[in-house]
Amino acid sequence: DEISEEDIETYYNKNEKNFILPTPIIKAVFFILPKNAPNLKEVKKWFKSDKANDQESLEDYCLTHAKKYDKFNNKWIEVKYILNLIPGDFNTLEKEILVVKNIEKEDDDNYYFLKINEMRHEQTLAPLDYVRDEITLILKNKKKLQFENDLEKQINEEGVRKKYVKIY
């Protein structure tokens, strides 16, 4: 039994208080380049740009040269998972991320780039697409429980009707 999009949205809207974010989430692009990677000046230009062709160039470049390349443009991810991959003090980075959309850091071997496209702060309502799977699971479990309760009720009623069962 499939859960409809309408059912999901209705549940979400009626239960917003249950979907408050405990931690910030982002949609972003994250990559790590070795210090000796070619054309770093060009990469930094693409990184700062919002033009589609620059973003394509950046993606092509990263697929070839990056030690790690993650594109979370269509999927929300908790900030802490990305911040753990970037050198520096976690709390300082977490504060910086609230203000700056493009973060560049380095250590002895690598450059770290994080380009934030969308962000939701903690203690705000989670976006529906972030909690959709959770809501679907809740609604499926509710349907299953309702089915089990209805089945038990039917069995009891039939048992009483056919005098297999006496309820005291």
Protein language model features and the residues they cover:
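Peptidyl-prolyl cis-trans isomerase
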Residues: 1-168
